[in-house]
Regions:
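Intrinsically disordered, low-complexity, charge-rich terminal extensions
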Residues: 1-175
């Protein structure tokens, strides 16, 4: 049986490849996301991207943050072999908007901001407000779970090497 720490470090590349693939999907192919959420409007790179290049003797870390920050430095880092370790995502569905950061090494979600809900005007309304908040949290989590499940199936298929990986490389080189 694998030690948890060994397994964690051995497979963290999957989460980082997932985030890199997700950025590619955000830039080039958002239409297929509608199959996971019929009300899907958009998925955008938010206000923070962290990339890391571990191919040299020392790890190089690049952080791009701020509203309206240019992502060209991130593309340049991808060209040099970096992988995304954190990605802030803006998810829009119907008239609703979520924003959160996804960490590659563990796929932890942090700073999840959900759409605002109605306030409870009486004690009877509290249960409805709580259930609405649970639904809104779950909707963002379900999207990430479905995207990751799709990614893992794609990653172990022949399509990854024959089609998807070359498309990602082409996107990185042409940006």
């Amino acid at each position: 049986m694998l030690d948890v720490a060994v397994a964690y470090s051995r497979y963290q590349f999957l989460g980082e490849e997932f985030l890199t693939w997700l950025w590619f999907v955000i830039e080039k192919n958002q239409n297929f996301i509608k199959s996971f959420d019929p009300d899907f409007v958009a998925l955008e790179v938010g206000n923070r991207v962290v990339l890391e290049n571990r191919k040299k003797d020392a790890a190089e870390r690049i952080t791009i943050k701020g509203d309206g920050a240019s992502l060209e430095e991130g593309i340049l880092a991808l060209k040099k072999g970096s992988l995304i370790t954190e990605l802030n995502i803006v998810y829009k569905s119907a008239e609703l908007r979520w924003q959160f950061t996804l960490k590659g090494e563990s796929l932890n979600i942090s700073t999840l901001s959900i759409p605002s809900t109605g306030s409870a005007e009486s004690e009877e309304d509290i249960e409805g407000v709580v259930l609405e908040k649970i639904f809104l949290y779950d909707k963002a989590l379900q999207l990430i779970e479905k995207l990751y499940a799709h990614f893992t199936k794609l990653r172990v298929s022949d399509t990854w090497h024959s089609s998807e990986s070359p498309l990602i490389r082409k996107w990185i080189q042409s940006s």
